[in-house]
Amino acid sequence: MTSITRRLFLSLAAALAPGAAAAHHGWGGYDTSKSFTVTGKILKSTFENPHCEIEMEDGGKHWHFVLAPPSRMQARGITADLIAPGKTCTVFGYPHMSKPDEARIEYVILDGKRIELR
């Protein structure tokens, strides 16, 4: 790789990296002044990076909930089986400001046990 090509590649990589990190880790889109709780059956779940996710319904509204990364979930004792479809849980979180069906979850209650995710 020539010196100019290498510098161009490194400059481009450095310029794009912060944007990708901000897009992934930005929680600024969630309104922490409007917390809420939902209890119900899990309809769908994913246990994979970058974040685990579950879908539930409450009062006829379909919700998409963003949980913690799998490594943090496992560190707190939550496995894929505990958030499998058909399981009942309670979530406490904050709604997304521009996506009315999405929320970031702060903690879950599974089998009567409160588990912090952040």
Predicted regions located by residue number:
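Short nucleic-acid-contacting surface segments enriched for D/E, G, S/T with interspersed K/R
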Residues: A75-T90
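OB-fold/S1-family single-stranded nucleic acid-binding modules
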Residues: M97-R118
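Conserved hydrophobic positions within beta-strands
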Residues: G40-I42
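N-terminal export leaders
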Residues: R6-L10
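Short aromatic-glycine-enriched beta-strand elements
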Residues: E48-E57
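Short boundary/loop segments of OB/S1/cold-shock single-stranded nucleic-acid-binding domains
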Residues: A22-S35
